[in-house]
């Protein structure tokens, strides 16, 4: 693994460790080319030994042949990534929702998916900035809505993250409307970071149209809030129509802080009415659902979102955990905790990610000393060795779960929410 002055890649091991196993698997495939299990095992070995393109080929063939266990799906994404195929890696990692929640591969797959999606979004925003002059001639898509964090006008630090949580709830509610598509947080974060804009900057007359163009959004929801004497909440939300030159209309609400969730719902319904959209009974019912009525849990959730936006995933996971403990029925907090933990696991380049997530290989058994399956287990290839206690049989096709993968920014095709 050493070439000239090149550094050693500690994420892989010497192919000689697997020489006998590779020969046996290749022989098996010559005799039975349709053996998806043999291709799976060979692909896992190639991934461990740095033959990434060969690993991708064999693991894709195994997947096409019906192998859908968590280790194979995880390894397929990693093989694509190590081969420099980012879009294909994203497509593989996005299938983390197909894995059992108890699988040890679900969290790193989710984290890597989100990390690569953020990289893609930032690259797209940079390209859009480079070609910004041409964007002014493009008609904005009115059905696409961006929701930015609300800007805090008060002085009490305890309530400063609340704008993140309010924006997230508004975005979740607007996403229930079939006629609308809400800009993903990953793309929103990329635009705000590249423009070096804070929440207060976005609501400025000069900034909002530019932000909307870069988001590809025909509408932009922004606003301000304040908490007076820790008892009274004032919310002001503006709806920018990018195709119109005039300043936006503002929806305002003032009530007791404990009425936060009712106020947020009222704002959403008013914004939708201002857009001229008539909701179905089903859409109205979904929007009316309140994820939590616990203010402290919601504040912790909002803090987690703020940490997450800053790339502080450990602190974000801790805040989301506190929110979930405060209100165990707060499903968004539980999901966000898993997301932040996945991001924490998935940081770094592909080589360091492989090194920290795959179980290191141990010394090889003597070739010919044991059956192939036993030797693969001893070499930590997987074959069940990495299952966590209580997991269902991960060699069987994983059952689908109810949550859907987050939608990626365009391109890369095709992931959709």
Regions found by a protein language model. Give the residues of each.
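Conserved structural position within tetratricopeptide repeats
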Residues: 27-31, 61-64, 97-98, 324-325
């Amino acid at each position: 693994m050493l070439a000239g002055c090149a550094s050693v890649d500690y994420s892989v091991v010497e192919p000689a460790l697997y020489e006998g196993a590779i020969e046996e698997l290749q022989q098996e495939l010559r005799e039975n080319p349709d053996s998806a299990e043999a291709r799976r095992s060979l692909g896992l070995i190639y991934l461990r030994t740095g033959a990434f393109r060969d690993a991708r080929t064999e693991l894709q063939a195994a997947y096409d042949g019906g192998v859908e266990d968590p280790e194979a799906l995880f390894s397929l994404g990693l093989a694509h990534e190590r081969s420099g195929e980012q879009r294909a890696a994203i497509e593989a990692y996005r299938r983390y929702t197909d894995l059992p929640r108890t699988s040890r591969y679900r969290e790193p797959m989710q984290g890597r998916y989100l990390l690569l999606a953020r990289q893609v979004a930032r690259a797209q925003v940079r390209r859009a900035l480079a070609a910004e002059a041409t964007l002014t001639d493009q008609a904005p898509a009115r059905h696409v809505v961006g929701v930015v964090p609300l800007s805090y006008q008060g002085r009490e630090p305890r309530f400063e993250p609340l704008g993140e949580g309010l924006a997230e709830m508004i975005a979740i509610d607007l996403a229930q409307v079939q006629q609308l598509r809400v800009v993903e947080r990953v793309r929103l974060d990329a635009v705000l970071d590249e423009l070096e804009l804070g929440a207060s900057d976005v609501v400025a007359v000069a900034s909002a149209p530019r932000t909307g163009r870069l988001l590809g959004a025909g509408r932009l929801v922004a606003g301000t809030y304040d908490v007076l004497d820790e008892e009274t909440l004032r919310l002001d939300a503006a709806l920018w129509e990018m195709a119109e030159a005039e300043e936006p209309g503002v929806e305002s609400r003032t009530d007791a802080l404990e009425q936060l969730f009712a106020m947020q719902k009222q704002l959403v319904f008013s914004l939708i009415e201002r857009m001229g959209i008539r909701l179905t009974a089903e859409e109205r019912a979904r929007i009316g659902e309140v994820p939590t009525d616990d203010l402290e849990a919601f504040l912790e959730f909002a803090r987690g979102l703020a940490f997450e936006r800053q790339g502080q995933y450990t602190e974000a996971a801790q805040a989301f955990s506190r929110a979930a403990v405060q209100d165990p029925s707060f499903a968004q907090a539980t999901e966000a905790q898993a997301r932040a933990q996945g991001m924490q696991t998935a940081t770094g380049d592909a080589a360091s990610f492989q090194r920290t997530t795959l179980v290191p290989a141990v010394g090889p058994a003597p070739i010919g000393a044991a059956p192939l399956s036993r030797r693969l287990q001893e070499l930590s290839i997987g074959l069940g060795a990495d299952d966590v206690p209580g997991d269902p049989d991960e060699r069987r096709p994983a059952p689908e779960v109810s949550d859907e993968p987050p939608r990626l920014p365009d391109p890369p095709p095709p992931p959709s929410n």
